[in-house]
């Protein structure tokens, strides 16, 4: 299964993910850059850590399986930035098939309303993996997937941008999530997110010299990437791991990290068939 360890790198928190005793995510730093304020990147001290275990079985309204088991070990790291007297927590959940983590901001007088300039969550790869990716684009996901080594993304990205009316490719090494990866040892990785609510969608930008992915959030018209009011939290960042590619697709990790259904009565929710009129318009009824 999956394991995770946390370390303090000169006041900056880093995490590592192992699978069956072998690293699949090398030590990767975490933090957020704020607009017009001291960033939540470093200068932290660990105030408290706590662990817990959770195990439940729940039923989705509709889905591939009737019952879904939500079983994880949790680590909550409570941080203080003494120079600003601000507090931030990072919550990690470790499943058999991967991990999820998110930033949490408790209610506090020195961090109430704040604007995120960029989130700097890193995912350090352990090698030049094979990747299945589409270009990082704020406006469309309608691309064919490209299979290549991580080191080849830069050279292939422009050729992977198909003709489309709305395109904003943000970086020569930017890709969208979810991204699927395969190591030389046959271990599969998937990087994505869960519980995306009132926050920007996460893309990934690759440092192709060091083979490190870093989160890259979709901006608004002013270039801001998140408007926050504590107490609040970010979406979960997810890493699914397996030596069987089919298990990546079968994983319930993201479903388990999504927020529970808020409707008391779900009897009115029914699956339906949908005919896409948009495709009828642009394809002219061609098969």
Predicted regions and their residues:
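N-terminal accessory beta-strand-rich subdomains and adjacent acidic, glycine-rich linkers
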Residues: 2, 7-262
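Substrate-binding cleft of carbohydrate-active enzyme catalytic domains
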Residues: 268-287
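Conserved catalytic cores of very large enzyme subunits
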Residues: 265
């Amino acid at each position: 299964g999956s394991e995770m360890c946390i370390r303090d790198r000169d006041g900056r928190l880093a995490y590592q993910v192992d699978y069956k005793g072998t690293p699949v995510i090398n030590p990767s730093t975490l933090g957020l850059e704020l607009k017009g304020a001291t960033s939540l990147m470093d200068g932290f001290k660990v105030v408290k850590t706590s662990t817990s275990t959770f195990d439940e079985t729940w039923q989705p309204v509709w889905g591939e399986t009737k019952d879904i088991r939500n079983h994880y070990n949790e680590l909550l790291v409570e941080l203080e930035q003494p120079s600003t007297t601000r507090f931030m927590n990072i919550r990690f959940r470790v499943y058999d098939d991967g991990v999820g983590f998110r930033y949490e901001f408790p209610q506090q007088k020195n961090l109430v309303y704040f604007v995120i300039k960029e989130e700097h969550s890193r995912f350090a790869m352990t090698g030049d993996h094979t990747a299945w990716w589409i270009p990082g684009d704020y406006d469309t996901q309608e691309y064919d997937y490209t299979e290549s080594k991580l080191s080849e993304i830069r050279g292939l990205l422009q050729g992977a941008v198909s003709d489309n009316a709305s395109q904003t490719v943000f970086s020569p090494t930017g890709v969208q999530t979810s991204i699927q990866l395969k190591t030389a040892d046959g271990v599969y990785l998937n990087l994505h997110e869960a519980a995306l609510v009132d926050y920007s969608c996460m893309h990934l930008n690759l440092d192709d010299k060091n083979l490190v992915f870093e989160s890259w959030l979709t901006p608004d018209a002013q270039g801001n990437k998140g408007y926050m009011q504590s107490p609040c939290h970010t979406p979960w960042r997810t890493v699914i791991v397996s030596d069987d590619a089919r298990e990546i697709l079968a994983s319930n990790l993201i479903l388990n990290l999504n927020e529970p259904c808020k409707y008391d009565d779900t009897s009115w929710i029914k699956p339906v068939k949908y005919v896409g009129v948009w495709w009828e318009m642009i394809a002219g009824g061609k098969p």
